[in-house]
UniProtKB/Swiss-Prot annotation:
Its main location: cytoplasm. Modulates RecA activity. InterPro entries: RecX_HTH_1st (IPR053926), RecX_HTH_2nd (IPR053924), RecX_HTH_3rd (IPR053925), Regulatory_RecX (IPR003783), WH-like_DNA-bd_sf (IPR036388). Belongs to the RecX family. It is found in: Cytoplasm. One of its GO terms (cellular component) is cytoplasm. It comes from Lactobacillus delbrueckii subsp. bulgaricus (strain ATCC BAA-365 / Lb-18). This is Regulatory protein RecX.
Length: 271
C-alpha cells in the first residue's frame, strides 16, 4: 500500500500534484481530488490508484469536450476526433461522450436539425450538399433524412435563389440561355437536384425579353469582332460563331449578326 505524503496545488488553477511515499506520483483535477477525498496520510492500493487514474482520464476528457462544445454545437464524431487529437484514450473518450450525451450536451439529431435550419436561413447549399456535409460530421443517415424530411421544395428554392441571384446582373450582357446554364450549373454544384435547379432558374429568369436578348447579342458580337478582326474573313467568322455560341446564342441569332442584320457590317468599326 502506498501512502499519500503530500498534496500540493499546481500553478494551473484546479490541478493538484499527488506524492506517494515522498515521491511525485501523478496529478489530478479538483473534481478527482474531491471524488476520492485524497488527503495526506491516506493509503492507496494499486487497484485504487488505477481507479483514480481511470477516473482522472475520464474527467480530463469530459473537461476538454465541454470546453470544445462551449464554442459551438458539435457532433459526437467531432468531439471524439477532438479528444483523440489530444491523446485521450478511446475508453476515456467514450465515457466522456456518453456522459455528455446523457446530459443533453451532445445530440446528433438536434445538431442535424439546427444545421439544416441554419442553411435554410443563411446558407447556400441544396439538400445533396447538406446531406454530404452532415455525413462528413458523422451523423447517421436516418438522422440526416429525418432533419431533411420537413423541408419543402419552396424552402429549398429560397436557398437556391440566394445562391444564384448575383448572376441576374448578367441579363442583357449574355444570352438568356447562357444565364440559365450558369445558374443551373452553380445550383447543381451546390447539391440541388436537376428539377429544383430548373424550378429556381425558371422562377428567377422569365422568358427572354427581346430587347435584352438583342442588347446581349450586340454586346457579345462586338466583343467577338474586336477580338478576332485581325483574322481573314473566313477564319474570323468561324471564330466569332464559336465565341457567340459559347455565350448561349442560337445559330439563327449568330447568323443574323454575322450577315449584318443586327448591326450593318460596315458600321462595326464605329462601335
Amino acid at each position: 500500500m502506498a501512502i499519500i505524503t503530500k498534496v500540493s496545488a499546481q500553478k494551473r488553477q484546479g490541478r493538484y500534484n499527488i506524492f506517494l511515499d515522498q515521491e511525485y506520483a501523478f496529478s489530478v483535477s479538483e473534481k478527482t481530488l474531491a471524488e476520492f477525498v485524497l488527503l495526506k496520510g491516506q493509503e492507496l492500493s494499486p487497484q485504487k490508484i488505477n481507479e483514480i487514474l481511470d477516473y482522472e482520464a475520464s474527467a480530463k476528457a469530459s473537461d476538454l469536450a465541454a470546453r470544445y462544445l462551449s464554442y459551438q454545437p458539435r457532433t459526437i464524431k467531432e468531439v471524439t476526433d477532438y479528444l483523440s487529437q489530444h491523446e485521450i484514450s478511446r475508453s476515456a473518450a467514450k465515457r466522456a461522450v456518453n456522459e455528455l450525451t446523457h446530459l443533453g450536451y451532445l445530440d446528433d439529431a438536434a445538431y442535424a436539425r439546427l444545421f439544416v435550419k441554419n442553411n435554410l436561413q443563411v446558407g447556400k447549399n441544396g439538400p445533396g450538399a447538406v446531406r454530404r456535409d452532415l455525413k462528413k460530421k458523422g451523423i447517421d443517415d436516418d438522422l440526416i433524412e429525418a432533419a431533411l424530411a420537413d423541408v419543402t421544395d419552396e424552402e429549398w428554392a429560397g436557398v437556391g435563389k440566394r445562391l444564384v441571384k448575383s448572376l441576374l446582373g448578367q441579363q442583357g450582357k449574355i444570352a438568356k440561355r447562357e444565364v440559365d446554364r450558369k445558374m443551373q450549373t452553380k445550383l447543381l454544384s451546390h447539391g440541388f437536384s436537376g428539377s429544383l435547379a430548373q424550378a429556381v432558374t425558371q422562377d428567377l429568369v422569365p422568358e427572354a425579353d427581346e430587347d435584352q436578348e438583342r442588347a446581349a447579342l450586340v454586346k457579345q458580337g462586338l466583343k467577338a469582332y474586336k477580338r478576332f478582326k485581325r483574322y481573314e474573313p473566313g477564319v474570323r467568322e468561324q471564330k466569332m460563331r464559336q465565341y457567340l455560341y459559347s455565350h448561349g446564342f442560337s445559330g439563327d441569332e449568330i447568323s443574323a449578326f454575322l450577315v449584318g442584320e443586327i448591326i450593318p457590317l460596315e458600321e462595326l468599326e464605329e462601335y
